[in-house]
Amino acid sequence: MKKYEILGGNLPVVVCELSAGESMITESGSMSWMSPNMKMETISGGGMKKMFGRLMSGDSMFQNRYTAEGADGTIAFASSFPGAIKALDIRDGHSMIVQKSAFLASEEGVELSMHFQKKLGKGMFGGEGFIMQKLSGNGTAFVEIDGHAVEYELDAGQEILISTGYLAAMEETCTMDVVTVKGVKNMLVGGEGVFNTVVRGPSKVILQTMPISKVAELLTPFFTKNK
């Protein structure tokens, strides 16, 4: 990829400039606009195991590959929700674990696969999802962030306590666990839920300020009170 630019503030789009022959991989339906010489091809992106993994994580079983044919090309991918688009530098030894359905697009050298939480309870009770997505290989990947992205660099053994839904991404070297909110009264009337997610360093953690699940929870009463 020659270059990219993220535009639009909190209604973002990433515009990618490709050299002739270069390709971008994206989920079905993610392309917003492109130059006429961009050729689309629907691909499986791997064997049945990877296809099933994408289906389990809430994505389409197939992906689209866009290639600049004969000359340089332009292609744009817009976010599906108000927030941010984050560019991640993926390379050998620096894989990223991201929230389910965060993947927007990437260079062809990036591999998208499912990532199971090692303990079932971490995903079910921590609110981050039993299945997350793993970005590995080499290249630039773009992911969607719900709201504003806040980054922390954790030292080895350093921890951060995260409320349900606010974990957007973390490097693979981080570990994740789930803890219960202390005190029965806090659990029942504190309004913060029963479980929190603990991420332990070393490496980078990316948090988001407006999880879709929280927005849906706040809006639900307005759609149902007249029924």
Segments from the language model and where they lie:
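Composition-driven recognition of glycine/serine/threonine/acidic- and proline-rich low-complexity segments
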Residues: 1-227
